[in-house]
């Protein structure tokens, strides 16, 4: 009975919000009015249902037009004024799809991290909303990171759509300094590390809202895998190919630590492999090859360093022996010399 009452109240609030939006935007731009109405209809309080795809498509249709800022503002407004976990989760899904559909124009969620400010979000009205609240806190940080990927890379090419993009991306990355490639890769690995922190709570409800979040994250994951893979391939060539500008000692150390962090993500990310198994296998095979190569290079440096230390110690010992073998001579002066 309490569940039915909550459902009825939710329906009433949804209709009231839509009626208010019609009134508020009745004298404004028709496009802005449609954006707000489509957004409200896609982020209803109906539990266990993801945002209505038709209404989401209507919002996204403005993402590459001059009304893109209005679409983002409407979604962010909807997110920030609600205390309902179902509405907040659906709003985040809409924001995610807006980011994905307008990567070339999207300026990010702000000038820093944690712009969505959802770290304290909590809806304790039911077990379902408690479960969704954990996802909301994680998902907000995830979208903050996703919005910064184009800033880190300069763009967000989709290497799956056009094979030529992969060649162009590799040519572009090959022109970068090694340190810059490592910094880019470091940011992308941080993205993987955040995916590893996703909620692992047992699903109390077979919730299609959470299923859609997982689906969107998996799509992003494999796009990022392709971007990381291009950078690892360029770094691998610089490690093993003669005539190619080598990775310096400092860069090698940073790269080794980065690979260790990447390997530590593998187990947690393994649950996402099923979508593109071959790509995942190729990616982790490359990571293992690079890790082995960097370890070999580091071991070689350690051997050379040990040899240098041994030579230095031997030289010092010979110098001590030489000094010890020199007999002091006493010099006497005649008084007539003064």
From Swiss-Prot:
Listed InterPro entries: ANTH_dom, ANTH_N_plant, AP180-like, ENTH, ENTH_VHS
GO molecular function: phospholipid binding
Assigned keywords, A-Z: Coated pit, Cytoplasmic vesicle, Endocytosis, Golgi apparatus, Membrane
Any one of the GO CC terms: clathrin-coated vesicle
Organism the protein comes from: Arabidopsis thaliana
Domain ENTH: 27-157
Name of the protein in question: Putative clathrin assembly protein At5g10410
Location in the cell: Membrane, Clathrin-coated pit; Golgi apparatus; Cytoplasmic vesicle, Clathrin-coated vesicle
GO terms classed as biological process: clathrin coat assembly; clathrin-dependent endocytosis
SMART domains the record matches: ENTH
């Amino acid at each position: 009975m309490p569940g039915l009452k909550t459902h009825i109240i939710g329906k009433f609030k949804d209709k009231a919000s839509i009626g208010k939006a019609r009134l508020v935007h009745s004298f404004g731009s028709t496009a802005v009015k449609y954006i707000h109405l489509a957004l409200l209809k896609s982020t209803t309080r109906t539990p266990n249902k993801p945002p209505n795809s038709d209404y989401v498509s209507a919002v996204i249709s403005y993402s590459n037009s001059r009304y893109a800022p209005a679409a983002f503002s409407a979604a962010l407004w909807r997110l920030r004024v609600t205390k309902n976990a179902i509405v907040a989760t659906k709003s985040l899904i809409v924001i995610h799809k807006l980011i994905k559909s307008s990567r070339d124009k999207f300026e990010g969620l702000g000038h820093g991290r944690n712009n969505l400010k959802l770290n304290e979000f909590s809806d304790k009205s039911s077990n379902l909303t408690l479960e969704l609240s954990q996802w909301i806190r994680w998902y907000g940080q995830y979208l903050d990171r996703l919005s910064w990927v184009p800033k880190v890379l300069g763009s967000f090419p989709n290497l799956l759509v056009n094979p030529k993009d992969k060649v162009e991306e590799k040519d572009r990355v090959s022109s970068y300094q090694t340190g810059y490639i490592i910094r880019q890769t470091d940011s992308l690995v941080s993205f993987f590390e955040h995916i590893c922190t996703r909620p692992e709570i047992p699903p109390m409800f077979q919730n299609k809202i959470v299923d859609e979040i997982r689906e969107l994250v998996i799509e992003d994951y494999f796009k990022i895998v392709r971007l990381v893979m291009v950078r690892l391939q360029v770094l691998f060539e610089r490690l093993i190919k003669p005539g190619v500008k080598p990775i310096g000692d400092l860069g090698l150390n940073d790269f080794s630590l980065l690979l260790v962090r990447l390997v530590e993500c593998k187990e947690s990310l393994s649950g996402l492999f099923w979508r593109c198994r071959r790509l995942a296998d190729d990616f982790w095979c490359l990571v293992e090859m690079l890790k082995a190569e960097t370890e070999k290079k580091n071991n070689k440096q350690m051997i050379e360093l040990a040899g240098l230390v041994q030579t230095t110690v031997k030289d010092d010992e010979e110098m001590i022996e030489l000094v010890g073998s020199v007999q002091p001579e006493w010099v006497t002066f005649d008084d007539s010399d003064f």
